Curated annotation (Swiss-Prot):
This is Required for respiratory growth protein 9, mitochondrial. Required for respiratory activity and maintenance and expression of the mitochondrial genome. Residues 127-139, 318-333 have a biased composition (Basic and acidic residues). It is found in: Mitochondrion. It comes from the Eukaryota. Residues 72-91, 115-139, 316-366 are annotated as: Disordered. Disulfide bonds: none annotated. GO terms for cellular component: mitochondrion; nucleus. Keywords: Mitochondrion, Transit peptide. Belongs to the RRG9 family. Residues 116-126 have a biased composition (Polar residues). PANTHER family: NEUGRIN (PTHR13475:SF3). Residues 1-40 form a transit peptide. The lineage of its organism: Eukaryota, Fungi, Dikarya, Ascomycota, Pezizomycotina. It comes from Sclerotinia sclerotiorum (strain ATCC 18683 / 1980 / Ss-1) (White mold).
């Protein structure tokens, strides 16, 4: 048998030089030993370049086909029947047709292939050089070519297409000239005109002549009127304390007919709307909020009754005890504690400095 490494090397060489896919056939010049084995069908060869195929088949046809002695007595050889022979019926005509599919590579055919390939490459290079030298002639020839008149199309083998590769992105520098020109104009304008915040604000504040503001809602009008009337906020002179508000709710819940809204408003000297809001609310403060509320209410009471005291109004007892108004009388003030060094119960009563008449008489009576 022939060496497989020599066969593989030869196949690779032919594939690279002639760009031909060879079938897996025997390339040895020596006749192989024929045995009873199944012969495989060789796939049809791909279409070759006209110049390459012509040289190849001319070289192949020049070589006489070798008919070995072993080809004739194939049918006469007897051997044990195999499983493959039972399924395949081979005849001498079919065997001859199959022999035509196999090819034998010789040094002469290799030389012919190499010469044809080099001549084809030289012709293509010379054609390209002519087109580069006279581009206007090439363009004219391309323009006047009628596709209906051309009967034969020359086939040129290009680079193999990689179907698994991703499509190439368009490079950045391949941009139309118009877009670059307009872009440069925009950049020049941006550089020429510096940024000014006043210009931007003026554009924002520009109002069309026919623009009319939308209609304002009722609560917006009321809020604007209150802000105009009380610029510092709502600070009434009379406010009900949390205890008074709790009492109003309790009285109205227990006696709704007797303590109605007008009656409560007259009793506490507030507006009926304030009484309605007090009765309507359901808010209950938290312990922390309640403590803060008491502190703020105490400070408010001191400031309010301080102003009343300046006007000559006598404040209530609670606020008088806190020092608002005239304050506490002298007799109600606590005396400072007296510090003594003697023990309690051991000190003798002090005798008055002045001696009365009775005391003098006691000294004289025995």
């Amino acid at each position: 048998m022939s060496c497989s490494c020599t066969k593989r090397t030869l196949q690779l060489f032919i594939r690279n030089v002639a760009q031909v896919e060879l079938a897996a056939s025997s390339t040895s010049t020596y006749p192989p030993q024929r045995t009873n084995f199944q012969r495989f069908n060789v796939p049809s060869l791909p279409s070759l370049h006209p110049s390459h195929s012509r040289a190849y088949w001319s070289a192949y046809s020049s070589e006489p086909r070798r008919d070995t002695v072993e080809d004739a007595p194939i049918e006469n050889q007897e051997g044990p029947p195999s499983a493959t022979e039972g399924h395949i019926n081979t005849t001498p005509e079919k065997i001859d047709d199959m022999d035509d599919l196999f090819m034998e590579i010789t040094p002469e055919s290799l030389d012919a292939l190499a010469a044809e390939t080099s001549s084809g490459l030289a012709n293509s290079q010379s054609r390209e050089s002519k087109e580069l030298k006279q581009p206007w002639q090439a363009e004219k020839s391309r323009k006047f070519i009628d596709p209906e008149e051309t009967t034969e199309e020359t086939w040129t083998q290009g680079e193999p297409i990689d179907i698994f590769s991703k499509p190439m992105k368009k490079p950045r520098w391949d941009k139309p000239v118009e877009s670059l020109r307009f872009r440069s104009i925009k950049i020049d304008n941006a550089v020429a005109v510096p940024y000014s915040p006043q210009a931007s604000t003026s554009k924002r504040n520009m109002v069309r002549d026919d623009w009319t503001p939308p209609d304002r809602k009722t609560w917006m009008e009321q809020k604007a009127a209150l802000k105009e009337k009380f610029p510092e906020g709502w600070k009434p002179m009379k406010k009900l304390s949390p205890e008074a508000q709790a009492g109003i709710r309790a009285l109205h819940a227990q006696y709704p007919e007797q303590y109605s809204t007008p009656a409560l408003a007259d009793r506490f000297q507030v507006s009926p709307e304030a009484i309605r809001r007090i009765l309507r609310t359901k808010w209950v403060p938290k312990p922390e909020e309640e403590a803060d509320r008491e502190r703020r209410w105490f400070q408010r009471g001191k400031s309010v009754w301080g102003r009343y005291a300046e006007l000559g109004v006598k404040p209530p007892k609670r606020w008088r005890e806190e020092g608002i108004g005239r304050g506490k009388p002298e007799w109600k003030k606590r005396a400072a504690p007296v510090l003594t060094t003697s023990r309690p119960g051991t000190s003798e009563p002090r005798r008055p400095e002045t001696i009365s008449l009775d005391d003098q008489m006691e000294d004289r009576i025995f």
